[in-house]
């Protein structure tokens, strides 16, 4: 049956390939569409029939053929176009035998469930949905008033459906191509305005990873800019323990001494000679609110700077840190509609005074203008970033939390300043009401004077109170044996307050106690809610009087209709995977399947506090343990840690683990880290942050590591050699043949090997980093394992380690995790951005080990297919001895500057006119384009992209031949937005039609850039990073 089906479709497939190209160039026939569908049906039917060989009633919704773009027939065509008859012969020429793992050693994943003897090799989509629901049900959804930076929220459904669950928002990449990213950039400008307004400071970045790492970034920024070169950071005792743990980790690599104390003006005066900055929590960890104005003034008199970790919702009614003199404010936007997700992801915020605007870490959105003099947004001051500063950088921040930042901005837009203030007032009123009831029943409140949402209560036995709370369906916080804490939030209602009355043996109903208070008011009180009781009024000396969020965007879109239209308006300006492939080299922009995404909004995953007792998070622990099993299986390591919130954070974590291990064996003097010059900028930045001295290793003209230089430097620095960082396949897109030898050299000289897993999409199921010789590696779950990029985050960068390093994996001060000698925390949450781990878990379980191997094969094949097609039009910078690449390749545009006056940037901008996002631009080599198609793109889409680049090459040739001038042509004027072609004046040597419809298919389906080319220099010289406060 299958053979006859294949024969019937062979002619159709041949015709399809021809018609695909005809359709792209304008022959838009219904036949081509039908043939395309026939081709896809063949692929799916093939997969189903193959599955029938092993099952009598196989699932028909298997995931692999939906994830991998080319069908088996397409792949055979690709192989033959490259001169190979099968995958085995192709892979033999791509991957050196010395690093290949025999397939017999990678057959199937086991199970973390001891009762599951024969787990499925892979799950179908419906089977996995059932599995995910069953695992989610292992979590116990008990309402948590634990606080400590994590709170129950009401995520507006309009934001959940239209942003969080919308691929036009979550599949975008970082907005490096500003002309096709204006919607996201505007939203992030809204976010920056929100943060700057609420903190009362001049400027905010576009998000960091979380509150703890934002605190660490602030400390290091102040240290690096202290003119007196002081090295002590004074930290108030009343801060969150997780933030303190992250500060200690960051301080270690920079030689910063942290002094923990109750900060007073007198202490500041006494410590002035050696302290560069101070850190306070506002409100404090126990819930107290202090007036830090005198403290800040004293610090300023000694040229110290003040960092305040703060709560955005509290700042809607409390004096802002900027008002009382803070120089930097950090925190989390979690309270602005972001579910707890067992610890993340949440956007960390960072705002500072004007003094530090050109030193602020992370990405910064600024207003500039385009070629047509219209206002437009862009990434500003990019020379601050780690990929340029490398080992001179004091921050390695790369991936941040763009999607979560955008969601929090929409939350502020939806509620507006008045709505946010209402929410904050209700929380404060509820806390005041509860405090009054507790005190009337004889309880002592530690922070009774001033507070916002948190109370610390003295009790006879904290354990008994927590047990009783649990019986009532609530989690409270144990402070110590005789104190408990609780933090109220926007979800609190009468039922919750009544339950808290019962937990603390207050033998009254909420209504009864309310009436007692209301009738005792000086002038009586007939209010029907708690908000207007005099005991629920914030003291004037703490109450905020300055205005905030006065820009129209925060005062217009309060109905769901208006918000929905605004969200859609913004997303229509941004190109995403919903529109076209995004072939960014080293970024792995693959499919983020809906089935993978569904679990993250399940309340049983979304609404779990990270500090709940372990038995309440068994579902999450299952996901984490299963991911560890699968990741260590495919990498050849022994243990894993999920705390790092990005790939760069994973680098830093892995290197910090190496340092801890070496100190434990008396080798703490080792401080040299060898890094190839081809490495991504985060590598040297991470090494410097971990306290290493970076020594670069040369590369040869063919892109390979210079083994002679490596050996010489390893020998020269043998006594101090700590580590070698290697990316494999290399950042030039090649499987180097000598990698095992290189790693052996490092081990022979006493060093450890750090393996950068940024390019793991070429290796899964084919090579094991641990078997090659690495001691530790990080993985990018937002690349290889399908967590979406979100427009610049979230990300997850777990590290996998060999057994000898496992004892040093990061710990946490609240939740038991990590190694027995674990380093202090690298993120606020014990398991990092746990809320999105189900995405990678879903991908791996639905693909199975064999499916993951097939994905790697497809990624390699797709890259080489495209490289072959483009090689007769552009020079390829590097290939191996067989003229093949790995999963990505580099096109050389350097010659065109001399021949046509255009460069890689011009090609990138012209691609926008073809409705494509550009490849990675000018990295790892200036004036080149690095292309990575991933396994998810179809033959049709890859051919469409190749045809676009080939067409652009012809446009360049016209300049070379004098048919178009060098200073006025299709490329240097690109992109061409609608405003451009609609202008009355047209002084171009090409038609308007050719400018915007260079190929006929674009007349049917085109994504329009919303602005013309940005003026980058103007934006940096005239830095403007917030919306004007005009209503």
Curated annotation (Swiss-Prot):
It is found in: Mitochondrion. It is an enzyme of class 1 (oxidoreductase). Its cofactor is pyridoxal 5'-phosphate. GO terms for molecular function: glycine binding; glycine dehydrogenase (decarboxylating) activity; pyridoxal phosphate binding. The keyword Transit peptide applies. GO terms for biological process: glycine decarboxylation via glycine cleavage system. Its EC number is 1.4.4.2. Keywords: Mitochondrion, Oxidoreductase, Pyridoxal phosphate, Transit peptide. One of its GO terms (cellular component) is glycine cleavage complex. The modification N6-(pyridoxal phosphate)lysine is found at residue 783. It catalyses: N(6)-[(R)-lipoyl]-L-lysyl-[glycine-cleavage complex H protein] + glycine + H(+) = N(6)-[(R)-S(8)-aminomethyldihydrolipoyl]-L-lysyl-[glycine-cleavage complex H protein] + CO2. Residues 1-49 form a transit peptide. Gene3D superfamilies: Aspartate Aminotransferase, domain 1, Type I PLP-dependent aspartate aminotransferase-like (Major domain). InterPro entries: GcvP, GDC-P_C, GDC-P_N, GDC_P, PyrdxlP-dep_Trfase, PyrdxlP-dep_Trfase_major, PyrdxlP-dep_Trfase_small. Disulfide bonds: none annotated. Belongs to the GcvP family. The glycine cleavage system catalyzes the degradation of glycine. The P protein binds the alpha-amino group of glycine through its pyridoxal phosphate cofactor; CO(2) is released and the remaining methylamine moiety is then transferred to the lipoamide cofactor of the H protein. This is Putative glycine dehydrogenase (decarboxylating), mitochondrial. It comes from Schizosaccharomyces pombe (strain 972 / ATCC 24843). The lineage of its organism: Eukaryota, Fungi, Dikarya, Ascomycota, Taphrinomycotina.
């Amino acid at each position: 049956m299958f053979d006859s089906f294949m024969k019937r479709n062979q002619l159709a497939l041949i015709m399809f390939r021809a018609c695909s190209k005809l359709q792209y160039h304008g022959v838009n026939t219904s036949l081509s569409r039908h043939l395309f569908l026939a081709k896809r049906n063949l692929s799916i039917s093939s997969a189903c029939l193959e599955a029938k060989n092993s099952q009598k009633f196989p699932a028909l919704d298997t995931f692999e053929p939906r994830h991998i773009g080319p069908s088996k027939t397409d792949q055979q065509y690709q192989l033959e176009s490259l001169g190979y008859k099968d995958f085995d012969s192709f892979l033999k020429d791509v991957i050196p035998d010395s690093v290949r793992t025999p397939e017999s050693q990678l057959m199937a994943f086991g199970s973390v469930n001891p009762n599951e003897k024969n787990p499925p090799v892979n799950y179908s989509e419906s089977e996995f949905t059932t599995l995910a629901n069953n695992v989610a049900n292992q979590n116990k959804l008990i309402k948590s008033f634990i606080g400590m930076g994590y709170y129950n929220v009401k995520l507006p459904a309009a934001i959940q459906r239209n942003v969080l669950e919308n691929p036009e928002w979550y599949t975008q990449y970082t907005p490096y191509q500003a002309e096709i990213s204006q919607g996201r950039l505007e939203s992030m400008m809204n976010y920056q305005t929100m943060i700057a307004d609420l903190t009362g400071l001049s400027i905010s970045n576009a998000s960091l990873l979380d509150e703890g790492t934002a605190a660490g970034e602030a400390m290091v920024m102040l240290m690096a800019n202290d003119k007196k070169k002081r090295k002590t950071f004074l930290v108030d005792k009343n801060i969150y323990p997780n933030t303190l743990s992250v500060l200690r980790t960051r301080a270690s690599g920079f030689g910063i001494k942290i002094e923990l104390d109750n900060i007073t003006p007198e202490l500041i005066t006494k410590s002035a000679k050696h302290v560069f900055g101070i850190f306070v929590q506002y409100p404090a960890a126990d819930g107290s609110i202090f007036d830090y104005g005198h403290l800040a003034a004293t610090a300023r008199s000694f040229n110290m700077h003040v960092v305040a970790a703060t709560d955005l919702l509290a700042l809607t009614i409390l004096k802002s840190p900027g008002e009382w003199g803070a120089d930097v404010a950090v925190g989390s936007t979690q309270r602005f509609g972001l579910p707890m997700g067992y610890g993340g992801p949440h956007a960390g915020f960072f705002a500072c005074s004007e003094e530090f605007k050109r030193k602020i870490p992370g990405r910064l959105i600024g207003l500039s203008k385009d070629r047509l003099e219209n206002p437009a947004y862009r990434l500003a001051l990019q020379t601050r970033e780690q990929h340029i500063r490398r080992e001179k950088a004091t921050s390695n921040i790369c991936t941040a939390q763009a999607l979560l930042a955008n969601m929090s901005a929409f939350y502020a837009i939806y509620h507006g300043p008045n709505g946010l203030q209402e929410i904050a007032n209700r929380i404060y009123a509820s806390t005041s009401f509860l405090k009054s009831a507790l005190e009337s029943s004889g309880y002592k409140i530690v922070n009774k004077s001033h507070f916002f949402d948190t109370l610390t209560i003295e009790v006879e036995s904290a354990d008994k109170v927590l047990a009783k709370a649990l019986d009532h369906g609530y989690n409270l916080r144990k402070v110590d044996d005789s104190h408990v804490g609780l933090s109220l939030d926007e979800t609190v209602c009468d039922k919750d307050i009544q339950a808290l009355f019962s937990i603390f043996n207050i033998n009254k109903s909420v209504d009864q106690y309310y009436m007692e208070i209301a009738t005792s008011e000086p002038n009586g009180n007939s209010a029907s809610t708690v908000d207007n009781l005099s005991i629920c009024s914030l003291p004037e000396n703490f109450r905020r009087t300055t205005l905030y969020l006065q820009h129209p965007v925060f005062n217009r879109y309060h109905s769901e209709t208006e918000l929905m239209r605004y969200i859609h308006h913004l997303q229509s300006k941004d190109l995403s995977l919903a529109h076209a492939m995004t072939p960014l080299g080293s970024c792995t922009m693959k499919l983020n399947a809906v089935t993978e995404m569904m679990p993250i909004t399940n309340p049983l995953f979304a609404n779990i506090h990270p500090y709940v007792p372990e038995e309440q998070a068994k579902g999450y622990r299952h996901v984490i343990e299963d991911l560890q099993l699968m990741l260590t299986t495919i990498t050849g390591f022994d243990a894993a840690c999920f705390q790092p919130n990005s790939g760069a954070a994973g680098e830093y974590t892995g290197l910090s683990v190496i340092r801890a291990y070496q100190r434990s064996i008396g080798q703490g003097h080792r401080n040299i880290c060898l890094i190839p010059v081809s490495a991504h900028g985060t590598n040297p930045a991470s090494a410097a942050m971990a306290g290493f001295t970076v020594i670069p290793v040369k590369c040869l003209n063919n892109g390979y590591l210079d083994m002679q230089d490596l050996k010489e430097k390893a020998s020269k620095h043998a006594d101090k050699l700590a580590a070698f960082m290697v990316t494999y396949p290399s950042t030039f897109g090649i499987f180097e043949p000598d990698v095992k030898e290189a790693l052996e050299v490092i081990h022979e000289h006493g060093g450890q090997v750090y393996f950068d897993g940024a390019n793991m999409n070429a290796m899964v199921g084919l090579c094991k980093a641990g078997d090659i010789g690495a001691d530790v590696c990080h993985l990018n779950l937002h690349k290889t394992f399908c967590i979406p990029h979100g427009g610049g985050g979230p990300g997850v960068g777990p590290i996998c380690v060999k057994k000898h390093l496992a004892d040093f994996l990061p710990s946490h001060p609240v939740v038991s995790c990590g190694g027995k000698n674990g380093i202090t925390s690298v993120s606020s949450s014990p398991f990092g951005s746990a809320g999105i781990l189900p995405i990678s878990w879903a991908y791996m379980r639905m693909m199975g080990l064999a499916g993951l191997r097939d994905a790697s094969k497809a990624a390699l094949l797709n890259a080489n297919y495209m490289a072959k097609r483009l090689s007769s039009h552009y020079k390829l910078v590097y290939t191996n001895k067989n003229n093949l690449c790995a999963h990505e390749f580099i096109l050389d545009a350097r010659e065109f500057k001399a021949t046509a006056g255009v460069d890689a940037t011009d090609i990138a901008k012209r691609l926008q006119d073809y409705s494509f996002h550009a490849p990675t631009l000018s990295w790892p080599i200036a004036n080149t384009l690095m292309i990575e198609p991933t396994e998810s793109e179809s033959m049709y889409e890859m051919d469409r992209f190749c045809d676009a680049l080939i067409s652009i090459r012809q446009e360049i040739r016209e300049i070379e031949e004098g048919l178009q001038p060098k200073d006025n042509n299709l490329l240097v004027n690109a992109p061409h937005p609608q405003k451009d072609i609609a202008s009355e004046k047209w002084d171009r040597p090409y038609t308007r039609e050719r400018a915007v419809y260079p190929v006929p298919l674009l007349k049917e389906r085109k994504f329009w850039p919303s602005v013309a080319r940005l003026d980058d220099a103007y934006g940096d010289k005239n830095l403007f990073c917030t919306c004007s406060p005009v209503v």
